[in-house]
């Protein structure tokens, strides 16, 4: 085999190995991110009490707990299965979009099984669109959630100065921050999926070209 052909074969082998390694990392990060998204959706620590709040407590997307001022016990309400218990329409909308994003990222993980049956590049691109839609749902959920801060229950915990997009004496908690960071993560994952899909397309084109060269050389020898 000529040195140029050996170098080309070595480059092709490394190219395939690197693409597979990056693909495995992308899949692992997607699974980890799905777990984080489920935690953000379930945990009620999006906003919480502070030093100067009238009542102790915390709010999530669909579950919240507020003290009664006379004891340390918190009264908890809210359920995703019963939207009527949510104190604001904004909380209902935010719960819907964050819940939809959770379902999309889980569906993306289920799509990993398509790698065994379908074209790899196509699966990457399907997952990329799903992750991009997932990021859009996260953006909507995170933007709509503060619109419900003017609800009576939120004001009871955070004070009368609380209003839409004004948190009053309360503070933002870790689940809300994690959801905002998740938007950037989802965009990075979708971009990486597009890159991997395009690399698979170019890889298939190179393999097809190599096969054609082999067939032509065999035909010429005959």
Curated annotation (Swiss-Prot):
Tissue: Brain-specific.
Keywords: Membrane, Transmembrane, Transmembrane helix
GO cellular component: membrane
Subcellular location: Membrane
Spans traversing the lipid bilayer: 22-42, 96-116, 126-146, 177-197
Membrane topology: Multi-pass membrane protein
Tagged with keyword Membrane: yes
Matches recorded under InterPro entries: LHFPL
PANTHER family associated with the record: LHFPL TETRASPAN SUBFAMILY MEMBER 3 PROTEIN (PTHR12489:SF13), LIPOMA HMGIC FUSION PARTNER-LIKE PROTEIN (PTHR12489)
Family (UniProt): Belongs to the LHFP family.
Name of the molecule in the record: LHFPL tetraspan subfamily member 3 protein
Phylogenetic lineage: Eukaryota, Metazoa, Chordata, Craniata, Vertebrata
Gene responsible for this protein: Lhfpl3
């Amino acid at each position: 085999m000529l040195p140029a052909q050996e170098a080309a074969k070595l480059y092709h082998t490394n190219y395939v190995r690197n693409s597979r390694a990056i693909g495995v990392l992308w899949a692992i990060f997607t699974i980890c991110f799905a777990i984080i998204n489920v935690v953000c959706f379930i945990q009620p620590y999006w906003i919480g009490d502070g030093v100067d709040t009238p009542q102790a407590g915390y709010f999530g997307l669909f579950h919240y707990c507020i003290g009664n001022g006379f004891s340390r016990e918190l009264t908890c309400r809210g359920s995703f299965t019963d939207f009527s218990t949510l104190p604001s329409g904004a909380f209902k909308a935010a719960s819907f979009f964050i819940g939809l994003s959770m379902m999309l990222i889980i569906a993306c993980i289920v799509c990993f099984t398509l790698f065994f049956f379908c074209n790899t590049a196509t699966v990457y691109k399907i997952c990329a669109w799903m992750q991009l839609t997932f990021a859009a749902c996260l953006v909507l959920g995170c933007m709509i959630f503060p619109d419900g801060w003017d609800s009576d229950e939120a004001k009871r915990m955070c004070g009368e100065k609380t209003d839409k997009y004004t948190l009053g004496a309360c503070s933002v908690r870790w689940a809300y921050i994690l959801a905002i960071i998740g938007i950037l993560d989802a965009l990075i994952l979708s971009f990486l999926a597009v890159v991997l899909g395009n690399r698979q397309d170019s890889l298939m084109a190179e393999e097809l070209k190599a096969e054609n060269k082999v067939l032509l050389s065999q035909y010429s020898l005959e």
